[in-house]
Amino acid sequence: MCKVLIIMNVIFLDYEGVLDTFHFNSLEDIERRIKILASICKDYDCKVVIEASEKNAIDEETMEIADGSWVNKIFELFKKYGIECIGRTPNIEKKIGEYTYLPMWKEDEIIEYLKMHPEVEHYCIIDDDDTKAIMHWEVSDLDKVREHLVETIYYSNNPNEEGLLPKHKSEVAKILKKRRQYL
């Protein structure tokens, strides 16, 4: 018997800088951005995979959310607007030197998720890429997957430029036309 592989589109989603921002982080602000995300998911038949640092509030196996986590509110809004969250990227640690362990950067966790899920043919990352923007580092934790990135802004002198905006929808559409490179 042959196994059927259902091809899907996935959005790897960060929370901070996408759904909540420096100036606009009330539940109403987050809901406004989730409506934009819902429109993207509906129009391009996407499912969501969480790649945010807060992903650890979500159990990898059951997708249950830790009690008291503000992520609960986000998932309630996902449900309200029909956004299907199918998982989160794995936690991977990297050994640097003899004793230091650091979490892998998001790009490595996304690549690992893609290796584990060959059914993901098209993907887009929506993230504020904070290691480069906020930390002022020369490199980003998304450099290896940058061609799939729609970059949002966590902080701006013009608060109306922050977070997921309607203009990002066309950027997502362009990226989802690209086939993933098999890793």
What are these regions (language model features)?
Residues 1-7:
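Short, Lys/Arg-enriched N-terminal segments with co-localized hydrophobic residues
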Residues 7-8, 120:
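A structure-centric signal for secondary-structure junctions around beta-strands
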Residues 9-99:
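Alpha-helical substrate-recognition element adjacent to the catalytic core
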Residues 72-183:
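C-terminal cap/substrate-recognition subdomain and adjoining C-terminal extension
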